[in-house]
């Protein structure tokens, strides 16, 4: 494909226009009085959302150079979302401000490399000072962080706080759609482990990059599965019943994995494969725990069992299973509660008998996974559009509270960033000079952007609010339009969220400042209407030959005429 090249100021200007297009769409959502954004969908009703990363992912610009700028800011939002789960809008607003200031200085003749060094020194100092300002989570802080992260929704804050109380901050909390209008909390049997899908082609939800099945069956084995012939009997059986199947094995690879992927993508099977957790004997114990939780049987060579003879009676059953790139969460059915309690009692007896600290740690982990259960927040709303928006808010609140437990809390509303800017002023004036000093000042000026935008979204003059915040040394409460101690008022941010927003914004902005050339694909011209002899559908006559796909890959000899 032919390429388009853009150099120097032209390239940077195009990138900045793309950055602004995306950031201006996202920034209207920040703060408790942030606005909603309506997203057109190819099918069904439009979505109304208040979630920065969801909006960012939807934006695609006509100009190829501007689109690259938008994609770079999408990367900021996605990286912050992946690592912190929240703070995507803050990161986007910070990055936009830094890019604007940085490119303005480059155009005025500043050295891009020195600017970048200054920006990197600034963020290093900010991270140190942020850690000193951070306070440990205590009292009502989890409720407050969840409320702030969900846009001031008190019910969401209460629900997340209650869920963490019931299964602990390290426990498994999932969000699902309710069949009623009410949002409810339920604690049920379940567990999570740190293994994800064997192939991204198993994903069922492209937006969230997860594979999720309701009322699925589990095939548990400590064997490596390479040949599809091992799976033929059980797959044939499930193809008839239509039940989803998740295979948890030492490894699913080669022909077996390829066949599962093809048949899943063609809609022949609802299936996914996951690597079993842990290693060696601990893997066998982990599989046995999952078997007890789900009422299944581990297909093990130690017990002279083979995959070819597996029946549906050997499979575990779950209410729901959610598989991401790195983690799997099982929500079990309640029928196996007695067996789970007996299994926990057995592990506790092992715990009493061992002298090894390492073994005790691993046994305690198993007890926590089995006995802790899963808190399920069932989200209800009058319409599907509101339901999706509410679900996104609850997921943000959950992620923010987990981040708060990890690294603590700081004052919210952009107040902490504004306070940190004072330290950068000293760094710039006392330790640096030239363009490195300018780089520090770029970051310093950008730190007021989130608080300014929160004020604008609340209908106030952003510059006036920033000036008053600095004069009074207080934060701006956008809900009541008053100036107060936001930490004391319970308007909090997770330290980890603020830290990652800063680091990701500086990372992208400093790279854009040092850009001198942009290379983009040249858009292909649209095909002329009626090309092909006047009949635009004329070339499709040859598709009649697809009637021969009944055999789907030639596996009829294995008793699977309908599969690949």
UniProtKB/Swiss-Prot annotation:
Cytoplasm listed as a keyword: yes
Disordered: region residues: 521-541
Keyword Ion transport assigned: no
Enzyme class: isomerase
Subcellular location: Cytoplasm
InterPro entries: Chaperonin_Cpn60_CS, Cpn60/GroEL, Cpn60/GroEL/TCP-1, GroEL-like_apical_dom_sf, GROEL-like_equatorial_sf, TCP-1-like_intermed_sf
Name of the protein in question: Chaperonin GroEL 2
Quaternary structure and interacting proteins, as annotated: Forms a cylinder of 14 subunits composed of two heptameric rings stacked back-to-back. Interacts with the co-chaperonin GroES.
Organism from which the protein derives: Prochlorococcus marinus (strain MIT 9303)
GO cellular component, one term: cytoplasm
HAMAP family in the record: CH60
Catalytic function, reaction form: ATP + H2O + a folded polypeptide = ADP + phosphate + an unfolded polypeptide
Biological-process GO terms, alphabetical: protein refolding
Function field: Together with its co-chaperonin GroES, plays an essential role in assisting protein folding. The GroEL-GroES system forms a nano-cage that allows encapsulation of the non-native substrate proteins and provides a physical environment optimized to promote and accelerate protein folding.
Biased composition (Gly residues): 530-541
UniProt keyword terms in alphabetical order: ATP-binding, Chaperone, Cytoplasm, Isomerase, Nucleotide-binding
Signal peptide range: none
Superkingdom field: Bacteria
Pfam families: Cpn60_TCP1 (PF00118)
Family: Belongs to the chaperonin (HSP60) family.
């Amino acid at each position: 494909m032919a390429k388009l090249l853009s150099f120097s100021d032209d390239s940077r200007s195009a990138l900045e226009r793309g950055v602004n297009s995306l950031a201006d769409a996202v920034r209207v959502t920040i703060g408790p009085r942030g606005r909603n954004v309506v997203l057109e969908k190819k099918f069904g009703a439009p979505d109304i959302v208040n979630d920065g990363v969801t909006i960012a992912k939807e934006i695609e610009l006509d100009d190829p150079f501007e689109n690259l700028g938008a994609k770079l800011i999408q990367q900021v939002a996605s990286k912050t979302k992946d690592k912190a789960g929240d703070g995507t809008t803050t990161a986007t607003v910070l990055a936009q401000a830094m890019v604007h200031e940085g490119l303005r200085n480059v155009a005025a003749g500043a050295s891009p490399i020195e600017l970048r060094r200054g920006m990197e020194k600034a963020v290093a100092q900010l991270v140190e000072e942020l850690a000193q300002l951070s306070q440990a989570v205590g009292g009502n802080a989890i409720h407050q962080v969840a409320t702030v992260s969900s846009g001031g929704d008190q019910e969401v804050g209460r629900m997340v706080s209650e869920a963490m109380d019931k299964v602990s901050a390290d426990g498994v909390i999932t969000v699902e759609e309710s069949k009623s209008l009410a949002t409810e909390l339920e604690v049920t049997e379940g567990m999570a482990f740190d293994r994800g899908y064997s192939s991204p082609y198993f994903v069922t939800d492209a937006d969230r990059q997860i594979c999720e099945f309701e009322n699925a069956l589990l095939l548990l084995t400590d064997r490596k599965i390479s040949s599809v012939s091992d799976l033929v009997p059980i797959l044939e059986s499930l193809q008839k019943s239509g039940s989803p199947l998740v295979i948890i094995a030492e490894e699913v690879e080669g022909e077996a994995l390829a066949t599962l992927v093809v048949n899943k993508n063609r809609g022949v099977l609802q299936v996914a494969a996951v690597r079993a957790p842990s290693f060696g004997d601990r893997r066998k114990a982990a599989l046995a725990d999952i078997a007890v939780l789900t009422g299944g049987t581990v297909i093990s060579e130690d017990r002279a069992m083979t995959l070819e003879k597996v029946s549906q009676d050997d499979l575990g059953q779950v209410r729901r299973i959610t598989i991401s790139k790195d983690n799997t969460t099982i929500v079990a059915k309640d029928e196996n509660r007695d067996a789970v309690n007996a299994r926990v009692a057995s592990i506790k007896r092992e715990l009493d008998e061992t002298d090894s600290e390492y073994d005790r740690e691993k046994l305690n982990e198993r007890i926590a996974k089995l006995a802790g259960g899963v808190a399920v927040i069932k989200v209800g709303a009058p319409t599907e559009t509101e339901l999706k928006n509410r679900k996104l808010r609850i997921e943000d609140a959950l992620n923010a509270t987990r981040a708060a437990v990890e690294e603590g809390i700081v004052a919210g509303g952009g107040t902490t960033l504004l306070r940190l800017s004072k330290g950068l002023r000293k760094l710039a004036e006392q330790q640096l000079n030239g363009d490195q000093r300018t780089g520090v000042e770029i970051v310093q000026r950008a730190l007021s952007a989130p608080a300014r935008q929160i004020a604008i979204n609340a209908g106030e003059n952003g510059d006036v609010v920033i000036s008053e915040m600095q004069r009074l040394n207080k934060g701006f409460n956008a809900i009541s339009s008053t100036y107060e101690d936001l930490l004391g008022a319970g308007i909090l941010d997770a330290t980890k969220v603020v830290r990652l927003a800063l680091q990701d914004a500086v990372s992208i902005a400093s790279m854009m400042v040092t850009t001198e050339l942009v290379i983009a694909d040249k858009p292909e011209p649209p095909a002329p209407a009626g090309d092909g002899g006047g009949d635009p559908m004329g070339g499709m006559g040859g598709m009649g030959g697809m009637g021969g796909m009944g055999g789907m890959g030639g596996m009829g000899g294995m008793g699977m005429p309908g599969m690949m």
